[in-house]
Amino acid sequence: GRDGYVVKNGTNCKYSCEIGSEYEYCGPLCKRKNAKTGYCYAFACWCIDVPDDVKLYGDDGTYCSS
């Protein structure tokens, strides 16, 4: 697996979060995407040990089409 920002399906946008709320929000979010865990980094959810088939920010460029 790899580490990185997970993105919303179809938009390539990061999941924004607030520092301090990371474990209530980012941890479960990352686990739903089959990552080991995650936390809030630079106002977005950063996931640890993400499976290779899960798209991360940067895989399709950094354009966010919300």
From Swiss-Prot:
Residues passing through the membrane, by range: none
Disulfide bond residue pairs: C13-C64, C17-C40, C26-C45, C30-C47
Database matches in Pfam families: Toxin_3
Post-translational modification: N-glycans are core-fucosylated, heterogeneous and short which could be the result of extensive trimming.
Gene3D superfamilies per record: Knottin, scorpion toxin-like
Record GO biological process: defense response
Residues in LCN-type CS-alpha/beta domain copies: 2-65
Keywords assigned: Disulfide bond, Glycoprotein, Secreted, Toxin
Glycosylation sites: N9
GO CC terms: extracellular region
One Gene Ontology term of the molecular function aspect: sodium channel inhibitor activity
Coiled-coil stretches noted in the UniProt entry, renumbered to this chain: none
Tissue expression profile of the protein: Expressed by the venom gland.
Top-rank taxon: Eukaryota
Subcellular location: Secreted
Entry domain remark: Has the structural arrangement of an alpha-helix connected to antiparallel beta-sheets by disulfide bonds (CS-alpha/beta).
Biological role: Beta toxins bind voltage-independently at site-4 of sodium channels and shift the voltage of activation toward more negative potentials thereby affecting sodium channel activation and promoting spontaneous and repetitive firing. This toxin is active only on insects. This toxin has very low anti-insect activity.
Family the entry assigns: Belongs to the long (4 C-C) scorpion toxin superfamily. Sodium channel inhibitor family. Beta subfamily.
Protein name: Toxin Aah6
Protein species of origin: Androctonus australis
UniProt lineage: Eukaryota, Metazoa, Ecdysozoa, Arthropoda, Chelicerata
